[in-house]
């Protein structure tokens, strides 16, 4: 199994519970496809480098997980359609 890091930029204008629900949904998607979430890091609210959907700030989350090589594509496909996620990036971590 490979190690991956999924970075989520979540809408800053939503309530805390909605933001937590978006992160939980991302974790659920990872586990649904056979991945194991090892760590979730909340980096807090940060200013965006450029405006996204008329927003200047977003909450950053880093989700570390282990999975087979086919899982990141499935995860990205589902996260792409989540309403409260402004941007995402899934990268393979070095061993």
What are these regions (language model features)?
Residues 2-95:
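Structured, basic alpha/beta domains of bacterial-type, RNA-associated proteins
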């Amino acid at each position: 199994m490979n190690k991956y890091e999924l970075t989520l930029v979540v809408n800053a204008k939503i309530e805390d519970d909605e933001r937590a629900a978006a992160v939980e949904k991302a974790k659920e998607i990872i586990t649904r496809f056979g991945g194991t979430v090892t760590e979730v890091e909340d980096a807090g609210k940060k200013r965006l480098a450029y405006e996204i959907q008329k927003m200047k700030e977003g909450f950053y989350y880093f989700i570390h997980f282990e999975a087979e090589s086919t899982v990141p594509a499935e995860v990205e496909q589902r996260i792409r359609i989540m309403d409260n996620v402004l941007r995402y990036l899934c990268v393979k971590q070095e061993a």
